[in-house]
């Protein structure tokens, strides 16, 4: 059977960017940018993206394009006879399942809040405490959460059931174009608020005092971590799209374009959040509290708030659901490639699996609220720790070592694949950096995540 491929280069770029762009762009990037000296952090972050994110992304894409299969079989096609690099492909699959065990639930939260704003569930006259309290009410309702979570699972698998071009690519292209338009409209509106100048000054104006307060080491560490984790590298989510690529463009050039789209969304998210927070005198935070407890009262209290709140959560639905679709495609591709089953059968089997696997996260805030499986963390944070703290950094290190070591694919073969086509190319003199410095940086990030 001939392997599926993207219908266009734009489709590849938007689907890959959709995989990278997610909730972390909104609920983490703006906060750590403001905390770490604004413009200085953005500068260090961009440098870290070029030095860390782009090279590792090209390695995942190169394994996919070179092997023309999903992770397990791509490794087998490229590894030396008798070696066991392909075992990592199974860990990639486990990482994708783990990620979807909680990401589908969080996406369900976004859908829930989009519906609340659209139908007037949040309205003028509600107090800030009432609006913020609705998040706790939602978490305490397992039935409601399960419905929205399973809605995400079913919708995602239905889209993917239509195939790469007619399903994933077609839907993601529309979502990503709408997402980019929405975030520009929301940012422009935020910049018209009375606290916009003060908010943007805190967000992006370079501040030496802030760096002194938190330390240059903290700035560099946060920049490295954000550059690494924002792209969701290490579990094969990008590798599968490499297997669907053409040979017409170089991988470094395409990786840079994906990073530009990801960074644009992250920067625009801050342009939405900080002006609103400073206008209403609210301290900007991070994580779910920012999205579900800090921002909804602000939307309700601003002119036309229901409209702007609806647009914001529609943007969040697109940002999170594009990641869900991308990872679902990876899971389905592994099942089709490795077990030789049809896409329809892979969808049916994984529909049951993902519907069941998503329930522990749903129950972790209510029925199983006393269950803290890892280091005292609740279910969602435990699942996230396994993915972000272990599988992403270790997986990225495995991809890197496979691509640059003589025991794996080998640096020369990797660079030849990465440089195939038109566009930006890696120079051969980068070999020592890729073989020694880059692995050390990933080990540092991994160890910091454990501390």
Residue ranges and their predicted role:
Residues 4, 34-59, 144-145, 388-393:
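Extracellular loop-to-transmembrane helix junctions
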Residues 1-27, 56-61, 65-87, 246-250, ...:
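Membrane-interface "cap" regions at the ends of multi-pass membrane proteins
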Residues 88, 93, 339-351, 382-442:
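C-terminal membrane-solvent junction of multi-pass transporters and transport-like membrane proteins
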């Amino acid at each position: 059977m001939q392997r599926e491929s993207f219908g266009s280069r734009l489709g590849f770029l938007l689907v890959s960017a959709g995989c990278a762009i997610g909730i972390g762009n909104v609920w983490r990037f703006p906060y750590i940018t403001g905390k770490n000296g604004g413009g200085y952090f953005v500068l260090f972050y961009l440098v870290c993206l070029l030095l860390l994110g782009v090279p590792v992304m090209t390695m995942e894409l190169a394994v996919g394009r070179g092997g023309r299969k999903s992770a397990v079989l791509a490794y087998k096609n490229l590894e030396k006879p008798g070696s066991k690099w392909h075992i990592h492909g199974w860990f990639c699959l486990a990482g994708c399942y783990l990620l979807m065990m909680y990401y589908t639930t969080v996406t369900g939260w976004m859908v829930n809040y989009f519906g609340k704003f659209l139908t007037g569930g949040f309205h003028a006259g509600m107090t800030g405490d009432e609006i913020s309290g609705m998040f706790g009410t939602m978490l305490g309702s397992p039935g409601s959460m399960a419905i929205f979570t399973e809605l995400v699972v079913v919708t995602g698998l239905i889209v993917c059931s239509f195939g790469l071009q007619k399903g994933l690519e077609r839907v993601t292209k529309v979502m990503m174009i709408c997402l980019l338009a929405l975030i520009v409209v929301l940012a422009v509106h935020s910049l018209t608020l009375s606290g916009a100048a003060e908010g943007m000054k805190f967000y992006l104006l370079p501040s030496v005092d802030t760096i002194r307060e938190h330390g240059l080491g903290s700035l560099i560490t946060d920049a490295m971590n954000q550059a690494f984790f924002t792209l969701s590298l290490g579990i094969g989510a990008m590798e599968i799209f490499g297997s669907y690529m053409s040979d017409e463009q170089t991988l470094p050039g395409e990786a840079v374009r994906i990073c530009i789209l990801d960074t644009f969304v992250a920067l625009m998210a801050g342009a939405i959040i900080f002006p609103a927070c400073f206008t209403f005198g609210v301290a900007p935070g991070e994580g779910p509290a920012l999205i579900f407890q800090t921002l909804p009262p602000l939307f309700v209290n601003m002119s036309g708030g229901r409209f702007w709140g609806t647009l914001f959560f529609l943007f969040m639905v697109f940002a999170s659901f594009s990641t869900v679709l991308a990872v679902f495609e990876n899971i389905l591709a592994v099942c089709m490639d490795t077990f030789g089953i049809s896409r329809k059968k892979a969808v049916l089997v994984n529909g049951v699996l993902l519907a069941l696997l998503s329930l522990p996260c749903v129950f972790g805030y209510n029925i199983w609220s006393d269950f803290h499986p890892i280091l005292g963390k609740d279910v969602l944070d435990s699942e996230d720790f396994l993915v972000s703290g272990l599988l992403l950094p270790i997986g990225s290190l495995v991809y890197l070592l496979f691509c640059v070591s003589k025991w794996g694919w080998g640096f020369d073969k990797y660079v030849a694949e990465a440089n195939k086509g038109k566009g930006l190319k890696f120079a051969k003199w980068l070999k020592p950096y890729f073989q020694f410095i880059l692995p050390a940086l990933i080990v540092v990030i991994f160890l910091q995540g454990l501390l």
